[in-house]
Amino acid sequence: MAKKQATSRIIAGDYKGTKLSFKPNKNLRPTESKTKETLFNWLLNDLHKKKCLDMFAGTGALGLEALSRGAEEVIFFEKQKALCGAIEVVVKKLGVKNKCRVINANSTAFDFKKLNTKFDLIFLDPPFNESLIQKSLNIISENELLTDKGLV
């Protein structure tokens, strides 16, 4: 019997209600709706025309939520190819390919100088079983990835 698809959804904005489907994975814990709602309520006025980086995209829920609420561009990093494919399916379905880039790579090993861009908002929600917060913050700082008023 095939494994059932798990789902999450975009909770507000232009793409509210859009389902994000993915194969269940014991190492994946999508951001819960309540957590997303709280985060995006704080950011409400800070998303319009912003460039965002999702360093550990997983299902893409945070970056896609940002797009739904007015972000100009999102770059997603995800090291699992299947999850990148799932994000790309949603990006295509929403018709926002021109606003997104999905990179199948480990963000903590990527040469960010190749991107030659700064971000207004960086989502940092690494796998729960790995200690990557400090390493990621160091990468953000060393590569000067934030704009002057950027947020992590």
Regions found by a protein language model. Name each.
Residues 1-152:
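Class I S-adenosyl-L-methionine-dependent methyltransferase catalytic core
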